[in-house]
Amino acid sequence: MNNAIILGIIWHLVGAASAACFYAPFKQVKKWSWETMWSIGGLVSWLILPWTVSYLLLPDFWQYYGSFSIATLLPVFLFGAMWGIGNINYGLTMRYLGMSMGIGIAIGITLIIGTLMTPILQGRFDVLLGTPGGRMTLLGVFVALIGVAIVSYAGLLKERAMGIQAEEFNLKKGLILAVMCGIFSAGMSFAMDAAKPMHEAASALGINSLYVALPSYVIIMGGGAIINLSYCFIRLATLKNLSVKADFSVAKPLLITNILFSALAGLMWYLQFFYAWGHAKIPQQYDYMSWMLHMSFYVLCGGIVGLLLKEWKCSTKKPVAVLCIGCLVIILAANIVGLGMAA
């Protein structure tokens, strides 16, 4: 195995670990509403960091964005908004299912929907049925379904074991949100495809191939930010049991700690761009490895962090054992789909 592939695997691990673990700092936020901490993290990950990075990368920030027509930018923005709906559902999935189970189910469903949606929308579903690679991909989808079912069963066992001690754990609500997450998260893939003219323009300015996609995040995540922040602000303004004033009236040391942990979560979320570095380091003939590595590391890291945070501190070990089996099945499914892409 050459150094490029080893480096690619390392960057994939960093990107997937950041994506899977970003919710961990939120777990340290105390006496704040979910909406307030999600908004603070979002301001960092969807607005501050994309704008800052793009400003540092581009020779002329305003000229670059001004060179595109509304017809080019609008689809990128709208698909970003679609992704934003998926992102809210992802965050709420973590809230109601926890990290280890939430990531397992959300990624499993995203794997299923993401694999099937593109060929269906492009009218090429027959390719999945009529080719060896397509049939292997469908096998991977079937295995992912089994994995999601196993992880869901682990959640049911956890629900029974923890009972009233699980304050926000809600299997039914979490499963519905995970399905919504899987459907709407496809917006990121569509947005990146629509943003290709922006990537080409960045490349023409001499920006390194590792970074050409980053300026498009200003538009993509701008769409997502409007959806996420609107959802949070409307709830904070209309629900009697939520209050920004109350959240920011906590003791000063706790206020600073909450802001820092929320901002750290936003930073870790943004560091998913290391995935692109890993993809760029993998030789073209092994492109399918990117999908396999990212999904596998994502589920693995999410499960490990969830266990370390003692989300599964039950009176019996059976739920944890079932969870581990389910996560391994989803990792297997990701690898089968990757092999199907390579066939």
Swiss-Prot record:
UniProt xrefs under HAMAP family: RhaT (MF_01532)
Reactions this protein catalyses: L-rhamnopyranose(in) + H(+)(in) = L-rhamnopyranose(out) + H(+)(out)
Subcellular location: Cell inner membrane
Keywords, alphabetical: Cell inner membrane, Cell membrane, Membrane, Sugar transport, Symport, Transmembrane, Transmembrane helix, Transport
Cell membrane listed as a keyword: yes
Record's protein name: L-rhamnose-proton symporter
Record GO cellular component, one term: plasma membrane
InterPro entries referenced in this protein's UniProt entry, alphabetically: L-rhamnose-proton_sym_RhaT
GO MF annotations in UniProt: rhamnose transmembrane transporter activity; symporter activity
Transmembrane portions of the chain: 4-24, 38-58, 68-88, 101-121, 137-157, 175-195, 207-227, 254-274, 289-309, 320-340
